[in-house]
């Protein structure tokens, strides 16, 4: 009987049925429970015809502070967000989060994945703000794993010896415009490029898969 060999050029096989979704948030503070979520971006990934990870679908929202949210002026100065600017086009959390979920579930279906996993730079921060917003709006059908994540700061420290996003991108030869940093969409795009670069570099070096399916079952 011929043994089936896992094809890791399919995304569903590369991450054990998980769909990596790269996210970034901009906030009005550091406390996910009390401080406002102001901006959210998310990008899904897919495999190209050669089994290399590439960016796929994206969404981006400016978000209205939830009722009673804390707004730290120092945080606004840091990220350059003017929450009173009518041109922001901000939407409530109960619009942004479900729309992101729709995109993620659509990508999961296309890639044959059973669940999504958050990828972010210093991922515990972004995951905490997303989870807090999900809880506030009582969102249903959350596609994300409740605690698993891929932290690109940790991965970049391992791969390149750099944990700061701009430094890691430079090491990976990814162009980075510091003037656009702290825009959720730009940071998500660069984090996506970095994550793909690290996964693809490991493939090129022969570091994945480590053993054949037959060897792994011995």
Curated annotation (Swiss-Prot):
A Pfam match: RNase_T
Active site: residue positions: 182
Residues spanning the membrane: none
Cofactor note: Binds two Mg(2+) per subunit. The active form of the enzyme binds two Mg(2+) ions in its active site. The first Mg(2+) forms only one salt bridge with the protein.
Positions that bind Mg(2+) 2: 24, 26, 182, 187
Matching Gene3D superfamilies: Ribonuclease H-like superfamily/Ribonuclease H
Keywords carried by this UniProt record: Exonuclease, Hydrolase, Magnesium, Metal-binding, Nuclease, tRNA processing
Gene Ontology, cellular component aspect: cytosol
EC number: 3.1.13.-
One BP annotation, GO: DNA replication proofreading
SUPFAM superfamilies reported for this sequence: Ribonuclease H-like
Domain Exonuclease span(s) in chain numbering: 21-195
Cofactor: Mg(2+)
GO MF, one annotated term: 3'-5' exonuclease activity
Domain of life: Bacteria
Binding site for Mg(2+) 1: 24
Keyword check for Lyase: no
Oligomer and partners: Homodimer.
Record-stated family: Belongs to the RNase T family.
Role noted for this protein: Trims short 3' overhangs of a variety of RNA species, leaving a one or two nucleotide 3' overhang. Responsible for the end-turnover of tRNA: specifically removes the terminal AMP residue from uncharged tRNA (tRNA-C-C-A). Also appears to be involved in tRNA biosynthesis.
Name recorded for this polypeptide: Ribonuclease T
Originating species: Actinobacillus pleuropneumoniae serotype 5b (strain L20)
Lineage: Bacteria, Pseudomonadati, Pseudomonadota, Gammaproteobacteria, Pasteurellales
Name of the encoding gene: rnt
């Amino acid at each position: 009987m011929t043994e089936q060999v896992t094809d890791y050029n399919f995304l569903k096989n590369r991450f054990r049925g998980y769909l990596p979704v790269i996210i970034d948030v901009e906030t009005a503070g550091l406390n996910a429970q009390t401080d406002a979520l102001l901006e959210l971006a998310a990008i899904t990934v897919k495999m190209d015809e050669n089994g290399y990870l590439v960016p796929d679908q994206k969404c981006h929202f400016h978000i209205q502070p939830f009722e009673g949210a804390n707004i730290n002026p120092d945080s606004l100065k840091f990220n350059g967000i003017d929450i009173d600017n009518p041109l922001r086009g901000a939407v409530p959390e109960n619009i942004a989060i479900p729309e992101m979920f729709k995109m993620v579930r659509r990508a999961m279906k296309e890639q044959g994945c059973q669940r999504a996993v958050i990828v972010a730079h210093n991922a515990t921060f972004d995951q905490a703000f997303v989870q807090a917003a999900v809880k506030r709006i009582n969102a249903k059908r959350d596609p994300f794993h409740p605690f698993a994540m891929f932290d690109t700061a940790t991965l970049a420290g391992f791969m390149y010896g750099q944990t700061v996003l701009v430094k890691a991108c430079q090491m990976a030869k990814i162009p980075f415009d510091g003037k656009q940093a702290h825009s959720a969409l730009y940071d998500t795009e660069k984090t996506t490029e970095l994550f793909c670069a690290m996964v693809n570099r490991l493939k090129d070096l022969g570091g994945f898969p480590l053993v054949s399916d037959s060897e792994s079952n011995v």
